Amino acid sequence: MFSRLVLLRKVSISLGRYYSSQAHPQTYIYNLLSKSKCRSCGIQLQDKYPDKPGFYRLPGQNDNNTDNKSKTSELNKKYEKILQNLDVSDRNLLINNFSAPKQEHEKITSVPSLQQVTPVEEDACDTLEVQKTQQGQSLSCKRCNDVIYNSKNKSVYDPKRDNLNKSEFPIPKLQQVLSTIPIDAPLVYVFSANDFPMGINQEIFQYRPPQQIFFVMTKSDILIPKTNVAFYNNFKKFLQNYMFKRFNVPRENVFIASGKDRWKMNDLYHFIPNYAYIIGDTNCGKSTLVKSLLINHHVKHWKYEARQQRQNERPNGKQSSSASLKNKDFKQLDRLIDSFSSKNGPGTSHIPGFTRDVVPVDIDGIKQLFDVPGFTTNENMQDIFDKLNHKQIARITKGTSTFKYGSLKSKFDTIKNGQVLSLNGVGYLQFPGQDSMYQIRNVTRFALHKFKNLEKVDSILQRNEIPTSMSSHFIVNRQQQQQQRNEIRGYYKRYIVPPFYGTIDLVIKDIGYINIKPTGKKLTNELMVLYLHPSLEAIIRQPILNYIDPPSPKKLIDGTKMKSFITSDIGKTPFYSRLIPSKIPSDPSSFLASSPSSDYNQLNQYLQIDESSESAYNDILELDETNKYDYWIE
């Protein structure tokens, strides 16, 4: 029976590759080259030029490192010294010398070296590893190994500046990525729940009609509790409506999953077409999603075999259709997943640009997918590595739970009277003055800190070194702290936050969002201003929680109920708005004392509103439910 299954699997693989070669010759080429590619990033492997991309080293191959040799030699010396001081019987036991002379007076004339004392099983493991290497399996380039095991290596970080070596982590544009994909191949566009809808690049519809693209929201564990089916259905219904009314994407082409928690993997397996290319923004979770599909399929086979084994262990040969797994089975499963994940691609990392070429992924010979490098529209995206160390990047891009930190029951902080909110030093949000008050809920990994005003922030950044007591609020590298001086005036970008009425989310790409709720009576039309590092992008949107756990519909004056957030016509009102780019005064003396009227003028000019018209934004305009979206632009 087992040989028959193996034969059927081989036949299905051969037929699949044959048909793919007929329909998509480019896909067939990727399959042929997959054995000589890095399993993690997809780059073509080479072993001749260590300083060029794709260099790899075979397992067991020496580094010719003199430091390692000296360390090994010193270890041998200590080992031999200890061995000489042992009794003969203990010495024979230590070195497994069972053929040693039995007489105590006989002495050992030579001491075996440390390399000779190796377990017998290691030879078999080495042989198996060599066989895997000869078959071209589980090979990774040096850069990928350094990211996983040695992140301080020069192939990852520039040793002179402790920042990202950008030549090893290229990030292409959308057009470059699509040029590597067959024009009629299925496309699966992955975007993150962490910064929705910023992960959807609308340029994709210039190359493919919306009816031919499948959309998958991943990292949904950040938004939706895994056990709450009602919340999942609510948000899925909203997302399908949004994608249909905003981009004309068929509702059945939209799916929600979580690669990290391997949530909805069985349904996702059937949702994604065979030979599909997985595309999306860099760091959106594409590789994690593909890897989770691969692991999920592997786990299903293992559970089936484990249950079969449990049935065979039952007394008196009793058979059962559902043999339960034991605790030791699940412990073994965790080890199996870790081992399988470390040996099978694609690789995953928090560093943008980790995937460098198309990575073919064969799921048990039944379905084949292609993990594609992520793209970006922000040319300054990698500049954040000039400011932060890699540990901080890994921390702030993980995201955090909406229901734990963003719900009405979550802890909030209060901002008032023109205070400035620091986003760990990579951004500063200036709030209006004149007795204004806001509730802030932090749904990011940023450590937020309140300053009295912008002058206080500026005075700290003007110092030669940030005080130790404040260092946790500025997560820049020590080497870069000196360079941060004057950057609010020059390097950081200034944005005007469009006017809003009610609660909003300030969304920061790849990071998360900050929920902002005005409290008390509105006394000023003064606008919020955001100073942001150029590598980051931000928008405002309607509160995402309203579409997961919507409030009960309110009754109108005539007694009818308002439509809920989920069933409302999302096409008639903007769901989000871009921020308004603003000029930073070149004169330092006028920088901290810019008037609100200057921001009003820039807002009206950007939206092409005549300042003499009634709709022009100014101090006398009344903002309410009827016009609260008039100054939003998608």
From Swiss-Prot:
Q: Name one GO molecular function term.
A: GTP binding
**Protein name listed in UniProt:** Genetic interactor of prohibitins 3, mitochondrial
Q: Where is the transit peptide?
A: 1-40
Start and end residues of each CP-type G domain: 171-378
Show which residues constitute the signal peptide. Answer: none
InterPro entries referenced in this protein's UniProt entry, alphabetically: G_CP_dom, Mito_lipid_metab_GTPase, P-loop_NTPase
Say what the protein does.
May be involved in the mitochondrial lipid metabolism.
The cellular component terms of Gene Ontology attached to this UniProt record, alphabetical and capped at eight, are: mitochondrion
Recorded hits in PANTHER family, A to Z, give: GENETIC INTERACTOR OF PROHIBITINS 3, MITOCHONDRIAL
User: Subcellular localization, per the record?
Assistant: Mitochondrion
Enumerate the PROSITE patterns for this protein: G_CP (PS51721)
Of which family is this protein a member? Belongs to the TRAFAC class YlqF/YawG GTPase family. GEP3 subfamily.
* The organism of origin for this protein: Candida dubliniensis (strain CD36 / ATCC MYA-646 / CBS 7987 / NCPF 3949 / NRRL Y-17841) (Yeast)
Chief site of localization: mitochondrion
Q: Which UniProt keywords apply?
A: Mitochondrion, Transit peptide
